[in-house]
Regions:
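Cell-envelope/extracellular polymer assembly enzymes that use nucleotide-activated donors
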Residues: 4-6
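Short, well-formed alpha-helical segments that are part of the catalytic scaffolds
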Residues: 8-27
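Acidic helix N-cap motif at the loop->helix transition within catalytic regions
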Residues: 16-19, 40-49, 91-92
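A conserved acidic beta->alpha catalytic loop
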Residues: 24, 35-44, 83
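Short acidic donor-binding/metal-coordinating loop in glycosyltransferase active sites
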Residues: 36, 56, 76, 82-86, ...
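A short, glycine-/small-residue-rich helix N-cap motif at loop->alpha-helix starts
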Residues: 57-64, 87
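Catalytic-site signature of metal-activated, phosphate-bearing donor transferases
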Residues: 63-66, 90-274
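Active-site nucleotide-sugar/metal-binding loop of Leloir-type enzymes
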Residues: 66-78
Length: 279
């Protein structure tokens, strides 16, 4: 039976993660690996699993995925964007198929999907990282990513819903790699903060203290967070105390401390870029 779903998976050197992602979406009619120059076994794995492998030079997190949505020969009515370090749970698979095959009728254009993180081998169910809603499942031709440097969100033309099934997020490339990735994120986040204070707002997810969870988070990030002192300390208090990271045990504490260091890097880069702005 056809699933009427196509998956788009952006990749760069994902040989350690990709098999888990591909196994989890084997029910799809089409799977497109959109690669930006892997030098490991990513392409070999794509060939082994019999999925489409397409190279496109990196144009940013949002731009890369939007290019794929515009140019890949996707034929399914429904599309799912999956990161290579994520996988679909059986419960989510069944829910997706019920919608895509018409067993469950819906007027929604897109759906938010929750995901849980694996950190140091343990599921994280607190720390402000659960629930973690991401709009990933949508009708073909009805959604695009906002043009943001990092942590971009999907903008959908039509009503949206929320699914019960979850994604699993686990990056298996090691702590050093994850830290280097967050250093890149810190640079991009700092640049986005400078854009906001200089009046160059992006056209995408609208910040609102009275909107949904993502809109509230964006409002805090853009309208409040850049102006607060010792943001790294506030982030630890938020994650470990307010969001009960302590309930996730040693892994929860480790994750909170890791993200505190990440926040310090954002603040350092932000200060650096602001000085450049006023020269």
């Amino acid at each position: 039976m056809e699933s009427n779903i196509s998956f788009l998976i952006p990749t760069l050197n994902e040989e350690q993660n990709l098999p888990f992602a591909l196994e989890s979406c084997s029910f799809a009619d089409q799977v497109f690996i959109l690669d930006s120059g892997s030098t490991d076994r990513t392409k070999e794995l794509a060939v082994r699993y019999g999925v489409h492998f397409v190279y496109h030079a990196w144009v940013g997190y949002a731009g890369q995925k939007n290019w794929g949505l515009d140019n890949l020969p996707i034929t399914s009515d429904w599309i799912f964007i999956l990161d290579a370090d994520e996988s679909i749970t059986p419960e989510l698979r069944d829910e997706l198929l019920a919608i895509s095959t018409g067993k469950v009728m819906t007027d929604k254009t897109g759906f938010y999907v929750n995901r849980f993180f694996i950190w140091e081998g343990k599921e994280i169910r607190h720390c402000g990282y659960y629930p973690s809603w991401n709009l990933r499942f949508f009708r073909r031709g009805r959604a695009r990513y906002e043009e943001r440097g990092v942590h971009e969100h999907m903008v959908v033309d039509g009503p949206v819903g929320y699914l019960k099934g979850e994604m699993r997020h686990e990056d298996r490339r090691g702590r050093d790699y994850i830290w280097q990735k967050h250093l890149k994120y810190a640079e991009l986040e700092a640049r986005e903060m400078v854009k906001v204070i200089s009046g160059h707002a992006i056209d995408g997810l609208k910040p609102s203290f009275f909107g949904n969870a993502l809109e509230r988070r964006r409002a805090v990030k853009e309208r409040l967070w850049p102006y607060l002192p010792v943001r790294w300390l506030l982030r630890f208090f938020y994650m470990y105390i307010l969001k009960k990271g302590f309930l996730d045990g040693a892994a929860g504490l480790d994750m909170c401390l890791f993200m505190t260091q990440y926040e310090k890097e954002i603040a350092r880069k932000y200060s650096e870029y602001r000085k450049q702005l006023h020269k």
